[in-house]
């Protein structure tokens, strides 16, 4: 960038079409967040009406994560083949219909299935919206694009909490899900009023359709085997999270089966770059394991252990959600300043100072608890706003939506496991201690995985001939691509 360009405020580097693209995707992500967190807000009410155990109730949160890997794969491939815009609209319609079905659910099984539909739509929205905005903005602003976009999910959670305090005490929990149908109107507007992402148009204009992940897996020579493996993975996940299996050994075997299937899909679709894809799934898995016990079970903790009424719960969740939203935006600035990986590590380290006090002070002072949650979520959860940018940089444009969608949403199974882990540990400890200890310990795993750039490092160890040296989104070097003490003369002298 020239000196004169650097002196221009960052927001003036964006034209009206780029701002419109961002605004549309951000609103879509807000609605996604609104619909997705509704179940966490009314979990105790649903549990009471359906007569569920705590673990069964937590599995309703997990259900949306179980289907996400397939939604990310299918809708991501749609985005790679037909454009990011169509995938985004389809995703919004899917999760809206699933939310409406939750409102009519007569029992546990029906609601579980509706949550599976929500998960598919949410996965598609994540992959398509993230790639859409990132590919529409200039390269030097793409951490901001990612962080600002993901803040919409947290804002949606804040809005949902406020609507919960107004609607549920008067009309009951089902009314909250009926409101979730409104995003369909927005989806129809999107289809007619937003342009396609610039990177995608440049890559595909006048060219034959790309061979997507769906083509490789379900139209290639191994299509029959892959269909059978897809059914096997879906069945195994169903039994793990909804089958009420009491035998830990069986659950472990089913989990291992799913891992083998997902790695097989990654090897087939990514070729020699499969080590990068597998490591990205592991990064996301632990990112969800450290963050989602709090995201999913904080409302339950506030209502049961702290005995807060709906109005006070909404107050505290406002601080939490608003902190995460602010953190996404702050993370965007940090990422463009320090580099994506360095910003991630610094923010998570700072968040560790706050996680224990959040669950140690009790509920006597709502304002102190709210402020602690605000800053903890700003630093710990908000930095995940640049995770799409981090993941997307490992994939080329023609595979980015499916690559991001699949790796992220397979890893997001950590979000399915997280609330159940929290609920199980809470059977021996109090819920607050369970949530705090899980988050504190697992955050360090994410710090190591991202700080050491393990996707590039493992790629270098296993298949060095396919090693990518630079981020495909912003061109910055991958620190894990060169051994410690190795020759880094090939790197561009820029922040990493």
Curated annotation (Swiss-Prot):
Protein's UniProt keywords contain Cell membrane: yes
Transmembrane segments: 22-42, 58-78, 86-106, 116-136, 148-168, 170-190, 224-244, 247-267, 278-298, 313-333, 353-375, 406-426, 431-451
Membrane topology note: Multi-pass membrane protein
A GO CC annotation given for this chain: plasma membrane
Keyword presence, Cytoplasm: no
Top-level taxonomic group: Bacteria
Any GO molecular function: carboxylic acid transmembrane transporter activity
Pfam families in alphabetical order: MFS_1
Keywords associated with the record: Cell inner membrane, Cell membrane, Membrane, Sugar transport, Transmembrane, Transmembrane helix, Transport
Subcellular localization, as worded in the UniProt entry: Cell inner membrane
Catalytic activity entry: N-acetylneuraminate(in) + H(+)(in) = N-acetylneuraminate(out) + H(+)(out)
Alphabetized InterPro entries for the sequence: MFS (IPR011701), MFS_dom (IPR020846), MFS_trans_sf (IPR036259), SA_transporter (IPR004742)
Family: Belongs to the major facilitator superfamily. Sialate:H(+) symporter (SHS) (TC 2.A.1.12) family.
Known role: Catalyzes the proton-dependent transport of sialic acid.
Name of the protein: Sialic acid transporter NanT
Organism: Citrobacter koseri (strain ATCC BAA-895 / CDC 4225-83 / SGSC4696)
């Amino acid at each position: 960038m020239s000196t004169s360009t650097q002196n221009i405020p960052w927001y003036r580097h964006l034209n009206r079409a780029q701002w419109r693209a961002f605004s549309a995707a951000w609103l879509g992500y807000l609605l996604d967040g609104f619909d997705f967190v509704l179940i966490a807000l009314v979990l105790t009410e649903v549990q009471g009406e359906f007569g569920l155990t705590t673990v069964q109730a937590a599995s309703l949160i997990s259900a949306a994560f179980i289907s996400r890997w397939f939604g990310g794969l299918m809708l991501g491939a749609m985005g790679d083949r037909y454009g990011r815009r169509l995938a985004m609209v389809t995703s919004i319609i899917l999760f809206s219909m699933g939310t409406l079905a939750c409102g009519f659910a007569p029992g546990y099984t029906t609601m579980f299935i509706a949550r599976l539909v929500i998960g598919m739509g949410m996965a598609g929205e994540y992959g398509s919206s993230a790639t859409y905005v990132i590919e529409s903005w200039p390269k030097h602003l793409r951490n901001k694009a990612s962080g600002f976009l993901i803040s919409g999910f947290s804002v949606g959670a804040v809005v949902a909490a406020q609507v919960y305090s107004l609607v549920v005490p008067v009309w009951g929990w089902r009314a909250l899900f009926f409101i979730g149908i409104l995003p369909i109107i927005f989806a129809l507007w999107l289809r007619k009023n937003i342009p396609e992402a610039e990177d995608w148009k440049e890559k595909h204009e006048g060219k034959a359709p790309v061979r997507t992940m769906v083509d490789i897996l379900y139209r290639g020579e191994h299509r029959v085997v892959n269909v059978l493996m897809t059914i096997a993975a879906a069945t195994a996940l169903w039994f793990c999270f909804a089958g009420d299996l009491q035998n830990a050994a069986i659950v472990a075997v089913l989990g291992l089966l799913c891992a083998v299937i997902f790695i097989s899909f990654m090897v087939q679709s990514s070729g020699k770059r499969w080590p990068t894809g597998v490591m990205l799934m592991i990064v996301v898995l632990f990112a969800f394991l450290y963050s989602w016990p709090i995201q999913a079970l904080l409302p339950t903790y506030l209502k049961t252990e702290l005995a807060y009424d709906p109005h006070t719960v909404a107050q505290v969740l406002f601080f939490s959600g608003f902190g995460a939203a602010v953190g996404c935006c702050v993370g965007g600035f940090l990422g463009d300043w320090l580099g994506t990986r360095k910003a991630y590590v610094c923010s998570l380290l700072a968040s560790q100072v706050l996680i224990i006090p959040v669950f140690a002070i009790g509920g006597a002072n709502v304002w102190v608890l709210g402020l602690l949650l605000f800053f903890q979520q700003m630093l710990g959860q908000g930095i995940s706003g640049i995770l799409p940018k981090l993941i997307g940089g490992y994939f080329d444009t023609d595979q980015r939506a499916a690559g991001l969608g699949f790796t992220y949403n397979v890893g997001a199974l950590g979000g399915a496991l997280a609330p159940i882990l929290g609920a199980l540990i809470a059977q021996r400890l109090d819920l607050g201690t369970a949530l705090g200890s899980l988050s504190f310990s697992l955050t360090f795993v994410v710090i190591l995985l991202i700080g050491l750039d393990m996707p590039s490092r493992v790629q270098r160890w296993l298949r060095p001939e396919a090693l990518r040296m630079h981020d495909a989104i912003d061109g910055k070097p991958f620190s894990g691509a060169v051994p410690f003490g190795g020759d880094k003369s090939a790197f561009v002298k820029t922040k990493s």
